[in-house]
């Protein structure tokens, strides 16, 4: 089965960035692992050729115990409220936190820069939330009632450093 133009552009974008990736056989899917400031970020890019949609999903390396899911759900909800692009999700059954960003491209206009930007955004957002997830998950179960997510989110020491200007 031939690749869609959008998947070809996605492959080209990954190659242009010199990113190491794996193609999933029989699907228009790329998987990759990125080293970010706080964590390693597994990433999944799926292309839907006919509607010309690319969906990028990055996964947090921290699995959330059921005992801590309410506080993590609050963190995600409050974080999503501030986002302009994409959203965080919590798989309630598995305790997996993901960041998903999707773009619908006009037919005939598969922009590799946009594809690379979607990947960068997903990695950056997972990296940004990772230390906050860690703080929640390290809180002993009996102390969760004392944890104020709004106060946790104000902690600047948990944010990665701002990128150096070029």
Residue ranges and their predicted role:
Residues 51-57, 95-101:
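Glycine-rich, often proline-containing surface loops adjacent to acidic residues and nearby aromatics
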Residues 1-12, 59-62:
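Terminal, regulation- and interaction-focused segments at domain boundaries
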Residues 134-165:
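Short, highly charged C-terminal tails/helix-capping segments
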Residues 84-87, 129-141:
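Long, hydrophobic, amphipathic alpha-helical segments used as structural scaffolds
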Residues 60-96:
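Short, internal acidic amphipathic alpha-helical interface segments
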Residues 101-103, 109, 115-127:
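Long, contiguous binding/interaction regions
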Residues 12, 17-41, 45-55, 61:
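Ser/Thr-rich, low-complexity intrinsically disordered terminal regions
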Residues 60-64, 103-110:
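A generic structural motif
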